[in-house]
Swiss-Prot record:
The presence of a 'disulfide through disulfide knot' structurally defines this protein as a knottin. This is U3-cyrtautoxin-As1a. Belongs to the neurotoxin 14 (magi-1) family. To aptotoxin III. Keywords: Disulfide bond, Knottin, Neurotoxin, Secreted, Toxin. Expressed by the venom gland.
Amino acid sequence: WLGCARVKEACGPWEWPCCSGLKCDGSECHPQ
């Protein structure tokens, strides 16, 4: 398990992917 980015945490090419059920909206993860 490699971890994941939660709501309002950074996401993108050099960050963790968003947790399940979240989407990357620009630079932060948000609920879908």
